[in-house]
Amino acid sequence: MERRASETPEDGDPEEDTATALQRLVELTTSRVTPVRSLRDQYHLIRKLGSGSYGRVLLAQPHQGGPAVALKLLRRDLVLRSTFLREFCVGRCVSAHPGLLQTLAGPLQTPRYFAFAQEYAPCGDLSGMLQERGLPELLVKRVVAQLAGALDFLHSRGLVHADVKPDNVLVFDPVCSRVALGDLGLTRPEGSPTPAPPVPLPTAPPELCLLLPPDTLPLRPAVDSWGLGVLLFCAATACFPWDVALAPNPEFEAFAGWVTTKPQPPQPPPPWDQFAPPALALLQGLLDLDPETRSPPLAVLDFLGDDWGLQGNREGPGVLGSAVSYEDREEGGSSLEEWTDEGDDSKSGGRTGTDGGAP
């Protein structure tokens, strides 16, 4: 798969901040969007990988050859052109990092959709691997180490992902030798005004959950640290630690009460008691209630050599039978032989695998 040199916000004027550089890149890219009558002019459309409120993702084979790609479609009646271009440009700028899903050249527009291609992850997303129990400790460490590097790469370029969750982690092989963070639809320059989530989310940090409209907070990398901590918990347990990081949620209150009590009780509340002390220390740092003292993502690297206490999770070469590929998931149900670019998305459910959420 062709990879070009990354375009970073540092390119050009060294004094230009990330937000200004990104806006400049969006403006330059506007003229590079290719209008086509149909996506079939350039791709053989194989099957639907997922869908969401703003579009869908299709498995497609370029007519010009090369590997299959995940073709992301965003509905033009629901997504601003600038929103589409921003996601595409951010993706192109950070594609050099293996922990971030590669966005390919050549943005398109049809009468109904904006579209761009991304690399295809054969094993789907991380949420599909998490069934009744969490991953083996080795795989949990592989996942969070790769994501920590990806987030540090974003943060070093003045960007915050702002949507770290299992659904947005794409898996390339059953043992997680490579995973990549996708869905850059909510990625913004650090300092961008950020409101509370439109609906309660288990991955949102308490400082955002506490906001009331129309209040906002400047977007900070600490938001991604919190998301990484929640994702670590999910990968280890196959469930979220709470429905929302806000009182009166009982699970969050139990955790918050434990970490804020001085001196801290030696025994954490369930389900945190399943983690060994090094993993607890890592989780407490990433899930620090104060964003000013929250650990950066790369703190993960200091704990990789420690025992995390996850020996009870599935072990052995056959433990990931649930890590089915997109082909296995879609078998017999999502042929695109009859689909057209004017297809009706209103009946689609689920998520897109790389869907950007609200514009």
From Swiss-Prot:
Pfam families: Pkinase
Location of the Protein kinase domain: 43-309
Keyword Nucleotide-binding appears in the UniProt entry: yes
SUPFAM superfamilies, A to Z: Protein kinase-like (PK-like) (SSF56112)
Catalytic reaction list: L-seryl-[protein] + ATP = O-phospho-L-seryl-[protein] + ADP + H(+); L-threonyl-[protein] + ATP = O-phospho-L-threonyl-[protein] + ADP + H(+)
Family, per entry: Belongs to the protein kinase superfamily. Ser/Thr protein kinase family. STKL subfamily.
Protein name in UniProt: Uncharacterized serine/threonine-protein kinase SBK3
Gene field: SBK3
